[in-house]
Structures are given as structure tokens and as C-alpha cells.
Amino acid sequence: MPTINQLIRNTRQPIRNVTKSPALRGCPQRRGTCTRVYTITPKKPNSALRKVARVRLTSGFEITAYIPGIGHNLQEHSVVLVRGGRVKDLPGVRYHIVRGTLDAVGVKDRQQGRSKYGVKKPK
């Protein structure tokens, strides 16, 4: 506990909160161009081939973004919309690609949770 004189000499510093998605620069989403589309393996104890893309954002950042859902049409030079949100078992992946916007099509034959994968209501 500081004394009154210590508090007069230098005041208490406010706690600065660090953003979990710095590349978005305070925006809800950002547009970017895929520079590489590839798969990586998750950390223990999980096992899979997770689809990710290296994306150069309009803010100038080069980030790794996860491609959610089963199957995708993304390739190099695809223009995508990126939102925040990490993937727990992929270290360094702190962003998600938004399906159903720009060049990323929605997930085919998706019935439930459609809004998260950019799928229109089936007729």
C-alpha cells in the first residue's frame, strides 16, 4: 500500500487492456486477400487437418485466419472478410474468415446454425 506522499509523487496508472485482435484496428471486420491457403495440425490432444489461410489485410497486417465449416472454395488471391475470434487448438490463429461474403461461399448442404456459415434458408 503506497503512502500519501508516494501517491502525490506519481499517481496510479490505469490498467491498459490489450486487444485480442490487434490486426482489426478496432473494426468489427476487415477485408483482406489470401496469400496462401493450407492446412495445419492442432496441438495435443487433438488430431486433424485444420484449414487456414494467410491473409493480407487492408490494415497492412499479414495474419493467419481459420476457414470454418466443411469444404471451401478459397485459393490464393481470394478476397475475404475477416472477423476476430481465436481457434483454441491452433496456436497463433486469432481470426476467422466470414463465410458467405465476398469470395468465400457458404457451406454446402448446411441445415443448422446456417447464419454462422453464410447459408440461406432452404426452400
From Swiss-Prot:
Question: What is this protein's name?
Answer: Small ribosomal subunit protein uS12cz/uS12cy
InterPro entries hit by this protein: NA-bd_OB-fold, Ribosomal_uS12, Ribosomal_uS12_bac
**What does the record give under GO molecular function?**
rRNA binding; structural constituent of ribosome
Q: According to its UniProt entry, what is the function of this protein?
A: With S4 and S5 plays an important role in translational accuracy. Located at the interface of the 30S and 50S subunits.
Q: Which GO terms describe its biological process?
A: translation
Subunit organization: Part of the 30S ribosomal subunit.
- Whether Heme counts among this entry's keywords is no
Q: Where in the cell is it found?
A: Plastid, Chloroplast
Kindly list any coiled-coil regions of this protein: none
Record-linked CDD domains: Ribosomal_S12 (cd03368)
Family note? Belongs to the universal ribosomal protein uS12 family.
Mainly resides where? plastid
Q: Which gene encodes it?
A: rps12-A
**Gene3D superfamilies in UniProt:** Nucleic acid-binding proteins
Do you know which HAMAP family this protein is assigned to?
A: Ribosomal_uS12_B
Q: Which keywords describe this protein according to UniProt?
A: Chloroplast, Plastid, Ribonucleoprotein, Ribosomal protein, RNA-binding, rRNA-binding
Q: Which Pfam families match?
A: Ribosom_S12_S23
Q: Which GO terms describe its cellular component?
A: chloroplast; small ribosomal subunit
TM helices/strands, residue ranges:
none
Q: Taxonomically, which superkingdom?
A: Eukaryota
Organism name? Atropa belladonna (Belladonna)
